[in-house]
């Protein structure tokens, strides 16, 4: 761990632009450069570092929401922020603090919902999985999934818990239960879809007021050549302007596309492990691949357009991007479950705009023509 700290210091002294001017070298971070020392240590957490970081959502450049699965004690000699392989999965010394917090553009914590840490401090739980806001909701409710609790939570913007779906630690496949839900996305009228999930193999559709409407999907476990609507690890969901529902069928290495009522339309294969899918405002589907550790861009016919990313624990490298988000200044944020951290990338000077991860929908900034 000490050698990592020394190496990181050396690397961070060398500007990316300087590396690009030399002969040889590599393009590790695509059109971005990593922002060092982001986020900053949380006051009062000396001796601890991030747990596994499940989700990140950029509301604005100065309000970036992060959810993590508790905090872990630092090994002797390590500094805050050091990545810990597989961190946050119930390790010895884990404490449930600052599971939901907000940082500004410099990585300083500006808000923490410590009143809700107790939600996740349950035996058998492992902490929040992803965090989002409904882009069509002017009240900007905050939605958080906890897969091991089998629950979905809806909070007011100020932090009041107003609605819960699912029963704590009870798995089910009916209209009142989940089987480790993973993600959520919305139609303009507030109708929403939940990817469900690690143990269930379905997408669940709810009305704007949260009533169960329908679900679709069957298990493909044990099948060598699974067909349409058969799934294994339904890990993410995104809805396009065309109202199509794009579903990460992770273990089957593909994206399946349905209409809003569950009719199968298409599938894109040979995407190794699609962890998270994001529909950009300009109508491209971006995917974080948890096996190749790359950020991938596809047009809506499924054509591969571009990809970048390098595996590893050093700043700028990736390991298990469970969720990513882009702010209004085109900064990219990633939440890594296996490196146990969130990272911020800013566009390089002169970066090709077509290679920058597209901005997602958010309130006040919807689809572009």
Q: What positions do the PLM features span?
A:
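Blade-loop segments of beta-propeller domains
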Residues: 71-139, 169-170, 312
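Short loop/turn segments immediately following the C-termini of beta-strands
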Residues: 61, 69-71, 147, 157, ...
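Beta-rich, blade/repeat-based domains predominating
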Residues: 47-59, 95-98, 118-138, 170-191, ...
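Blade-level signature of beta-propeller repeat domains, shared across WD40, Kelch, NHL, RCC1
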Residues: 319-369
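Conserved beta-propeller blade signature
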Residues: 63-65, 141-143, 191-195, 244-246, ...
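A short beta-strand motif characteristic of beta-propeller blades
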Residues: 38-46, 110-121, 163, 169-174, ...
């Amino acid at each position: 761990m000490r050698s990592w700290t020394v190496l990181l210091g050396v690397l961070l002294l060398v500007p990316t632009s300087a590396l690009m001017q030399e002969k040889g070298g590599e393009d590790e971070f695509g059109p971005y450069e990593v922002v060092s020392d982001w986020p900053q240590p949380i006051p009062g957490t000396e001796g601890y570092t991030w747990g596994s970081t499940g989700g990140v959502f950029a509301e604005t450049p100065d309000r970036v929401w992060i959810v993590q699965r508790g905090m872990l004690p630092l090994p002797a000699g390590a500094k805050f922020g050091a990545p810990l392989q597989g961190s946050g999965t119930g390790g010895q010394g884990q404490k449930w603090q600052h599971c939901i917090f907000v940082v500004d553009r410099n990585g300083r914590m500006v808000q923490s919902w410590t009143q809700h840490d107790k939600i996740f401090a349950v035996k058998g739980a492992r902490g929040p999985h992803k965090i989002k806001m409904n882009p069509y909701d002017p009240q900007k409710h905050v939605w958080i999934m906890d897969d091991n609790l089998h629950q979905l939570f809806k909070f007011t913007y100020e932090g009041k818990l107003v609605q819960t779906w699912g029963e704590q630690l009870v798995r089910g496949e009916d209209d009142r239960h989940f089987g480790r839900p993973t993600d959520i996305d919305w139609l303009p009228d507030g109708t929403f879809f939940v990817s469900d999930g690690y143990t269930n193999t379905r997408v669940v559709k709810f009305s704007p007021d949260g009533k169960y409407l329908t679900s679709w999907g069957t298990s493909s476990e044990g099948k060598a050549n699974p067909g349409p609507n058969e799934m294994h690890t339904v890990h993410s969901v995104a809805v396009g302007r065309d109202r199509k529902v794009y579903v990460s069928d992770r273990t089957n290495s593909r994206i399946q596309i349905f209409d809003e009522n569950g009719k199968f339309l298409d599938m894109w294969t040979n995407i190794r492990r699609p962890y998270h899918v994001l529909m950009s405002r300009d109508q491209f589907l971006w995917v974080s691949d948890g096996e190749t550790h790359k950020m991938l861009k596809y047009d809506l016919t499924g054509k591969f357009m571009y990809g970048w990313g390098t595996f590893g624990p050093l700043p700028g490298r990736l390991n298990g991007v469970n969720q990513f988000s882009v702010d209004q200044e085109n900064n990219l944020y990633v939440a890594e479950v296996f490196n146990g951290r969130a990272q911020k990338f800013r566009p390089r000077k002169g970066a090709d705009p077509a290679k920058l991860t597209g901005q997602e929908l958010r309130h006040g900034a919807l689809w572009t023509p």
